[in-house]
C-alpha cells in the first residue's frame, strides 16, 4: 500500500471551503471505488508553527491504483475538483510514502475506513520528520531499536501509553528526498507535549546510552509538527 502525504498551505480566508472540499468532495469521491481512501485530515495547531497548514494522508492500494488516481486528477472525473480546490490554497506539496518494515500500519482495510463524515472527538498527533546523515536504512533501524521498542516496553510495563507510534514511513523512490523518514504518532494525553514544551530536558536523559544522546550518531536535524485531527477525519 502507498500513502500519499500532502501538506496544504491554505488560504486563511477560505479554510472552511477547503475543509468542505475534502469532507464533501475528496472523501466521498474516493469512496465510490476501491483504489484509495482519505485516511487522516489534520490541522497544524495554531501557535505551534506555520499558520493555516493542513496535512492529509490518503491511502492508495498499489501503484496501478495510484496511476489511475493521478489520471483522474489530470484529465478525468477528479479534474474539476482539483481545480476548484486549488482556489482555496496557496500551495500543496506531496510525497508518496511506504511503511517501513517495523511500522505497525502496513496497509489499511478500506472497508473499515469511515467515509460518511461522522463526527468524533479531536485527537493530537505529533509528526516527526528526520533527515539523517547516515544511510536511511540505518536511521530507520535506529528508530525501531532506540525509540519504538523502548516506548513499547514502557507502555507494557506501566499500562500507560504516552506516545502511540502508529506508523513510520519513508519516501518512495522518485517522490522526495532519499534520506528522509517520518514518524506518525498519536498523543493520547496532551500533557505529554506540554511537559516537553515547558521543561528542560533532564541531564540524565542526555547521557550516553539514552535515545537523545545515541541518536545523534544518526541525525541532529528533525522537524516536529503538532497536528489536530478534524472532528470528521476518518482515522483519528
Per-region residue spans from a language model:
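Surface-exposed interaction/gating patches
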Residues: 2-14, 101-190, 229-236
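An amphipathic, aromatic/His-enriched active-site/gating alpha helix that lines ligand/cofactor pockets
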Residues: 16-40, 46-51, 59-97, 145, ...
Amino acid at each position: 500500500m502507498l500513502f500519499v502525504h500532502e501538506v496544504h498551505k491554505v488560504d486563511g480566508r477560505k479554510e472552511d471551503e477547503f475543509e468542505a472540499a475534502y469532507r464533501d468532495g475528496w472523501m466521498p469521491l474516493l469512496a465510490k471505488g476501491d483504489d484509495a481512501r482519505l485516511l487522516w485530515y489534520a490541522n497544524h495547531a495554531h501557535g505551534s508553527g506555520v499558520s493555516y497548514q493542513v496535512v492529509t494522508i490518503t491511502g492508495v492500494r498499489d501503484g496501478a491504483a495510484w496511476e489511475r488516481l493521478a489520471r483522474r486528477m489530470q484529465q478525468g472525473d477528479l479534474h474539476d475538483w482539483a481545480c476548484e480546490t486549488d482556489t482555496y490554497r496557496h500551495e500543496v506539496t506531496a510525497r508518496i510514502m511506504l511503511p517501513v518494515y517495523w511500522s505497525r500500519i502496513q496497509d489499511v482495510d478500506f472497508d473499515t475506513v469511515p467515509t460518511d463524515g461522522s463526527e468524533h472527538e479531536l485527537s493530537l498527533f505529533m509528526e516527526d520528520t528526520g533527515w539523517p546523515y547516515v544511510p536511511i536504512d540505518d536511521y530507520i533501524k535506529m528508530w525501531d531499536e532506540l525509540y519504538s521498542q523502548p516506548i513499547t516496553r514502557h507502555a507494557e510495563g506501566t499500562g500507560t501509553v504516552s506516545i502511540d507510534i502508529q506508523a513510520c514511513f519513508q519516501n518512495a523512490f522518485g517522490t522526495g528526498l532519499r534520506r528522509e523518514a517520518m514518524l506518525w504518532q498519536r498523543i493520547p494525553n496532551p500533557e505529554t507535549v506540554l511537559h516537553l514544551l515547558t521543561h528542560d530536558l533532564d541531564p540524565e536523559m542526555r547521557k550516553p546510552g539514552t535515545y537523545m544522546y545515541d541518536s545523534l550518531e544518526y541525525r541532529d536535524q528533525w522537524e516536529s509538527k503538532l497536528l489536530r485531527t478534524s472532528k470528521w477525519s476518518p482515522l483519528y
